[in-house]
């Protein structure tokens, strides 16, 4: 599949009731999404492995290119759905598992935004602890939770479960992990859920369940560190690519990335546009990341022609 190609896709998402077993009290939802919405989810899904290396010029572009190449290489278009590409069968089990996990993160973010209005989503192990270079733990251990944030200070915990098949054992583990957390700081959770992506007859599907909470755990971290973990990678991408325009911009800012084709036999390049408005850029420059999303709640529309703008204030376009 080609992320920069204008197209609308559908994915079947099964939503399971809180105290129901899979297959009972469920409903199937067909979600429509465009290539630009998926591209925005890929852009916004900073992966935890990125913190293993220090920042260098071009790091965020290289990470984004890697995520785009992965999605385009492991999925193929069948009508208006995405399916497992045949060539991934040449990979070994560990490689396929890693790819499924990364796809799970991207699609959990997309589904959470489309169905539940989640504006931001950050891996817990990218949120720094106060005054340290360490990251947030729960009960002494690192977890793979995705922390979501929506309007009106609505916090949520998501367990991404990416699998090649419908694994009830893996999904059950995700549900148990989601059920352990009750609060983020002093905020009761608006939602805690597991989201599993998997292939059925080759087609990409998903199932979401909000389990009954069995624990009273609290995740603690400064809110400003959460928003820094989400927005700083965008700022670094902007600053690396067009620093002169970024720091001298008085209007909206947009950069254009040149991407190679990942499809065999195609030559030349395609172009990806990423941008935001001038106020958001100013807040990024000042390191006031925690003010961006709260400001966006009062901004009616940043969308531009041939662009998709997320509720986070970041827009994408492609040609």
PLM feature segments, named:
Residues 114-138:
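A short acidic/basic microdomain associated with nuclease active sites
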Residues 144-166:
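Conserved catalytic cores of phosphodiester-cleaving nucleases, focusing on short active-site segments
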């Amino acid at each position: 599949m080609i992320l920069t190609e204008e197209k609308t896709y559908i994915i079947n998402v099964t939503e399971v009731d809180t105290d129901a077993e899979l297959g009972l009290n469920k409903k199937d939802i067909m979600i429509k999404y465009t290539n630009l919405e998926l591209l925005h989810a890929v852009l916004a899904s900073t992966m935890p492995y990125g913190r293993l290396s220090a920042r260098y010029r071009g790091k965020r572009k290289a990470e984004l290119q890697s995520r785009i190449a992965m999605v385009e290489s492991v999925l193929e278009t069948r009508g208006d759905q995405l399916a497992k590409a045949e060539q991934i069968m040449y990979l070994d089990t560990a490689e396929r598992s890693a790819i499924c996990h990364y796809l799970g993160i991207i699609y959990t973010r997309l589904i959470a935004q489309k169905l539940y209005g989640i504006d931001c989503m950050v891996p817990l192990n990218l949120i720094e602890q106060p005054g340290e270079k360490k990251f947030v733990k729960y009960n002494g251990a690192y977890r793979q939770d995705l922390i979501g944030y929506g309007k009106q200070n609505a916090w949520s915990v998501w367990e991404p479960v990416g699998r090649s098949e419908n694994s009830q054992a893996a999904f059950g583990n995700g549900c148990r992990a989601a059920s352990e957390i009750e609060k983020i700081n002093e905020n009761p959770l608006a939602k805690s859920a597991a989201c599993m992506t998997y292939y059925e007859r080759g087609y990409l599907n998903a199932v979401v369940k909000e389990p009954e909470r069995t624990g009273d755990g609290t995740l603690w971290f400064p809110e400003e560190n959460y928003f820094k973990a989400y927005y700083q990678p965008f700022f670094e991408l902007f600053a690396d690519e067009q620093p002169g325009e970024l720091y001298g911009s008085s209007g909206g800012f947009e950069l254009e990335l040149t991407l190679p084709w990942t499809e065999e036999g195609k030559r030349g390049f395609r172009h990806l546009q990423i941008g935001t408005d001038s106020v958001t850029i100013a807040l990024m420059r000042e390191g006031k990341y925690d003010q961006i999303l709260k400001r966006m709640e009062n901004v009616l529309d940043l969308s531009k022609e041939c662009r998709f703008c997320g509720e986070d204030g970041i827009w994408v376009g492609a040609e």
